[in-house]
Amino acid sequence: MAANGEEQQTQAGRHQEVGHKSLLQSDALYQYILETSVYPREPECMKELRELTAKHPWNIMTTSADEGQFLNMLLKLINAKNTMEIGVFTGYSLLATALAIPEDGKILAMDINRENYELGLPVIQKAGLEHKIEFKEGPALPVLDQMIEDGKYHGTYDFIFVDADKDNYINYHKRLIELVKVGGLIGYDNTLWNGSVVAPADAPMRKYVRYYRDFVLELNKALAADPRIEICMLPVGDGITLCRRIK
């Protein structure tokens, strides 16, 4: 009985406030990962941008350092060259991508806020990577619709990373599945949404976490049922679901 009581207390503690960036239940363990294998191997330009972004009032929006490392290696493993990113913020994941793709690789990057992108742009420029990036300011859906209408972009993307408005993830997926190549990957970020996907309905949550929670749950259910893709959900960062197009 004592063990069960301790377990219940632990579970209650985890749900005191849903909204922690790391999904690991031990902050010490997460810090160990960062200090042992992430920070020592982090490129200097990514470290600079990470530290710059940490001063931003909305720094929680950035891709975590361990996820940036994961994306960088993943892109190298699949030999990605033509990529897309929806939701850029200050550009940490964008920089991880630019470092991974070849010299003639391209990233179509879209965000509604150019100011945040330009905060990190000097770091990207100093690293000599700006030529790989085409940045478009504004909502991504009209751009995607135009690309699909043009017809020449179907199945042309090796990798697409989405870290934007969660209430549009389903709408993005409907379009991106046409633009990614067969065998290519789409990565949806925040699919475990601060752990809120398994939190009790009455658990205290930050307002933005509670607002987007149902949209994330809807996406996860839709991806699991989509016969056009293979999926893998990973507890990296705030949860990332990789979708490999198979048809």
Swiss-Prot record:
Q: Which residues bind S-adenosyl-L-methionine?
A: T63, E85, G87, V88, S93, D111, A140, D165
Any one Gene Ontology BP term: lignin biosynthetic process
List the cofactors.
Answer: a divalent metal cation
Stored InterPro entries: Cation-dep_OMT (IPR050362), SAM-dependent_MTases_sf (IPR029063), SAM_O-MeTrfase (IPR002935)
Q: Which residues participate in substrate binding?
A: K21, D163, N194
EC nos: 2.1.1.104
Ranges that cross the membrane:
none
Q: CDD domains annotated for this entry?
A: AdoMet_MTases
Query: What keywords are assigned to this protein?
Result: Lignin biosynthesis, Metal-binding, Methyltransferase, S-adenosyl-L-methionine, Transferase
Q: Which reaction does it catalyse?
A: (E)-caffeoyl-CoA + S-adenosyl-L-methionine = (E)-feruloyl-CoA + S-adenosyl-L-homocysteine + H(+)
Q: In which pathway does it act?
A: Aromatic compound metabolism; phenylpropanoid biosynthesis
A Pfam family (short name) is Methyltransf_3
* Keyword Cell membrane attributed: no
Binding locations of a divalent metal cation = D163, D189, N190
Q: Which SUPFAM superfamilies match?
A: S-adenosyl-L-methionine-dependent methyltransferases
Q: How is the cofactor bound?
A: Binds 1 divalent metal cation per subunit.
A single MF term (Gene Ontology): metal ion binding
The family classification in the record reads:
Belongs to the class I-like SAM-binding methyltransferase superfamily. Cation-dependent O-methyltransferase family. CCoAMT subfamily.
Role noted for this protein = Methylates caffeoyl-CoA to feruloyl-CoA and 5-hydroxyferuloyl-CoA to sinapoyl-CoA. Plays a role in the synthesis of feruloylated polysaccharides. Involved in the reinforcement of the plant cell wall. Also involved in the responding to wounding or pathogen challenge by the increased formation of cell wall-bound ferulic acid polymers.
What is this protein identified as? Caffeoyl-CoA O-methyltransferase 2
Identify the species of origin: Populus trichocarpa
Phylogenetic lineage: Eukaryota, Viridiplantae, Streptophyta, Embryophyta, Tracheophyta
Which gene name does the record give? CCOAOMT2
